[in-house]
A protein has these predicted regions:
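Conserved active-site-adjacent core of cysteine acyl-enzyme catalytic domains
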Residues: 5-11, 76-196
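Generic structural motif recognizing short loop/turn segments at the entrances and edges of beta-strands
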Residues: 1-2, 6-8, 13-15, 22-28, ...
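Generic hydrophobic segment detector
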Residues: 36-67, 81-122, 210-239
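Noncatalytic regulatory segments and standalone regulatory/sensor domains
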Residues: 161-239
């Protein structure tokens, strides 16, 4: 029997996937690259912020329509550097986005982790996957980053998971590089090797049909009470 755990803030409005944004009303959540212009990290972050009740879809559309807005200029520049398979040759790194997000939230609510031993944010691969599972069990989304042997890095938002035996955790994701299927809460599936402790390409991306490594994540923690305001127009952030 198929059993999966999904985050709390996902709904169907007719056949369309929706989430409750900043206003508390149901709004569009899935953003495909090209709708706002930009790279996968920015698109995944925007979906994360809607799922975390920090933004509404119309907030994003208003910024994208305003050609004088720094947000629009930044993501349009990234669109010009758009690479193959939804990657980017020069986009925002997840670690940098996490730092900027904490500035605009005025609190260290965003956390970034990676199992890449070349950085100081190192956790083991097993610990990284445990953090993904724990966050999803709390009903909260996770931005996950991966890379393949030759292709550029890619970022998606995990919104659910299932366990396929002891070895595999199957992640159900919103992937900005593709379309969302009719009456479905996800458009990509990534299998992670829960027992892997090395740098081998043992994870698998079903959308790109390629072996990858899920090696970094960004999560947003619950704010203290009262809830802190989120200022997407802060001059300290690049989007």
């Amino acid at each position: 029997m198929f059993t999966a755990k999904f985050i709390d803030n996902l709904y169907f409005n007719g056949a369309n996937i929706r989430a409750k944004g900043k206003s508390g009303k149901l709004c569009k959540v899935f953003a495909k690259q090209g709708q706002l212009d930009g790279a996968c990290v920015i698109y995944s972050l925007m979906m994360m912020l809607i799922l975390e009740h920090k933004l509404d879809w119309e907030d994003l559309r208003e910024k994208a329509r305003n050609s004088k807005d720094d947000f629009a200029k930044s993501i349009q520049r990234q669109f010009l550097n758009y690479g193959l398979k939804g990657g980017t040759r020069r986009g925002h790194r997840m670690c940098d986005v996490s730092k900027k997000l904490n500035v605009c939230m005025k609190e260290n609510l965003s956390e970034y982790y990676t199992c890449d031993k070349r950085t100081w944010h190192t956790v083991s691969r097993h610990e990284l996957y445990e953090k993904i599972r724990t966050q999803l069990d709390l009903g909260k989304p996770v931005m996950i980053g991966s890379h393949g042997e030759n292709g550029p890095g890619h970022a998606v938002v995990a919104v659910g998971y299932s366990r396929e035996g002891l070895k595999t955790m199957r992640l159900f994701c919103l992937d900005p590089s593709g379309f969302i299927p009719y009456m479905q809460l996800w458009n990509n599936v990534i299998d992670v090797d829960y027992l892997a402790e090395n740098d081998m390409l043992t994870d698998y991306d079903y959308h790109f049909e390629d072996k990858i490594i899920v090696d970094r994540i960004l999560i947003i923690n619950d704010p203290p009470k009262p809830a802190l305001s989120f200022d997407p127009d802060s001059k300290a952030i690049p989007f």
